[in-house]
Design a protein with these regions (language model features):
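Short-chain dehydrogenase/reductase
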Residues: 103-107, 150-162, 182, 190-194, ...
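NAD(P)H-binding glycine-rich loop region in Rossmannoid oxidoreductase-like domains
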Residues: 59-120
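Conserved Rossmann-fold NAD(P)-dependent oxidoreductase catalytic core, especially the SDR/UDP-sugar
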Residues: 111-159, 176
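N-terminal Rossmann NAD(P)H-binding glycine-rich loop of SDR-like oxidoreductase domains
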Residues: 27-47
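Conserved beta-loop-beta element that borders a ligand/cofactor-binding pocket
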Residues: 129, 162-187
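Mid/C-terminal beta-alpha module of Rossmann-like enzyme folds, strongest
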Residues: 24, 230-291, 306, 320-322, ...
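Substrate-positioning beta->alpha
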Residues: 188-195, 209-232, 239-243
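Conserved catalytic-site region of short-chain dehydrogenase/reductase
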Residues: 100, 130-140, 183-189
Length: 340
């Protein structure tokens, strides 16, 4: 029954896309408090979709736009997730946990999201990252780049992606798998980037991982959400990873300068958090220890090739310039830093 429903829905999506208009969806977002999950909920509602924001129980709900249904769901409980997404047509699994908790919770949350999407007959959407590739073999990385993760987190993510792709091939779910660089934007600040925003507002030195003069890539959370919705509405993009790059590669120090300029501060003094410091702090901090194994990306960056996205969707990926996205993020952080 679910396979037939998915086939009918895919045909309807194709028909709506051919007419140049998105098909209205019933969309549940797991991890709707987060940086990307919150953006997906907002953008989907703005696009006219019926949105259910699934948040952890026992905490105050963040302010969501009018019209978004907010429900509590414990992602560690399969029964809770099944109930939270009941009746939905799309399940976006955007829930995250702190790095030290990945081995325990990332596979568990993934299994429960998959089971819930399958039970609901829903499309499963899983935002991917670049950890699955390991170290880059080329300047720009396309979807066919070897997947050779050398980190614990990379191997965990690869196992989850392979499980989801196999479920798609077996007809259990329809899978959408956009792959992003580091996401930034209003809603939350990643631990690696928070010292930059704090330093900019105080006009003090900031900390940056490994190499501030290497290239890096970021994508605004609203752009990532918009691209995700586009891929959901593009059946040819289902069942495969599709890269969604940022607006351009940028030297990390130049990104930091944009943050300081937006704050009205002077030229930033950047103190690089080197490998030795990571190892030293990691003796006492599980978070620093876990962050260090993926810090190589700030010295040996993965820059995503967006050719496939353009080919499948017929247009460019959303691309807010850093000169626009950074001030927008800083404005949010200025008023929300206590909870960011």
């Amino acid at each position: 029954m679910h396979r037939a429903r998915r086939r009918i829905r895919a045909e309807a999506v194709t028909l709506f896309a051919a007419r140049g208009c998105p098909m209205p969806m019933k969309l549940a977002v797991l991890g709707a408090r987060g940086l990307l999950g919150g953006a997906v909920a907002r953008r989907a509602r703005l696009a006219g979709h019926q949105v259910r924001a699934v948040v952890r129980p026992g905490r105050d709900s963040p302010a969501f736009p009018m019209g978004i249904e907010v429900v509590a769901g414990d992602l560690s409980s399969q029964a809770s997730v099944l109930e939270a997404v009941r009746g939905m047509e799309v399940v976006v699994h955007a829930a995250t946990v702190p790095y030290p908790e990945w081995p325990r919770f990332v596979p568990l949350f993934a299994d429960n999201a998959l089971a819930a999407a399958e039970a609901a007959g829903a499309t499963l959407v899983f935002p991917g990252n670049v950890y699955v590739y390991g170290r880059p073999r080329s300047r720009f990385v396309a979807e066919d780049h070897p997947q050779e993760p050398h980190t614990v987190k990379g191997r965990i993510r690869l196992a989850v992606e392979r499980k989801f792709l196999q479920a798609h091939q077996d007809g259990r779910v329809d899978l959408v798998l956009p792959r992003y660089p580091d996401v930034y934007g209003p809603g939350a600040i990643h631990a690696d980037f928070r010292p930059v925003f704090e330093g900019a507002l105080a006009n003090k030195p900031c900390r940056w991982p490994l190499n501030a003069d290497a290239l890096h890539e970021f994508i605004l959370n609203d752009d990532a959400a918009e691209a995700m919705l586009k891929l959901i509405g593009t059946p040819a993009a289902h069942g495969r990873a599709v890269h969604v790059p940022g607006p351009r590669a940028i030297v990390s120090r130049d990104f930091i300068r944009l943050v300081y300029a937006a704050a009205g501060s002077g030229e930033p003094i950047v103190r690089v958090f080197g490998r030795g410091m990571y190892r030293l702090v990691g003796l006492f901090s599980p978070l620093a220890r876990a962050a260090y194994e993926v810090a190589y990306l700030f010295d040996d960056p993965i820059l995503l090739d967006g050719t496939l996205y353009r080919s499948l969707t017929g247009g460019p990926h959303p691309s807010t310039p850093y000169e626009v996205g950074v001030p927008r993020t800083l404005d949010w952080f200025r008023t929300h830093r206590a909870i960011a």
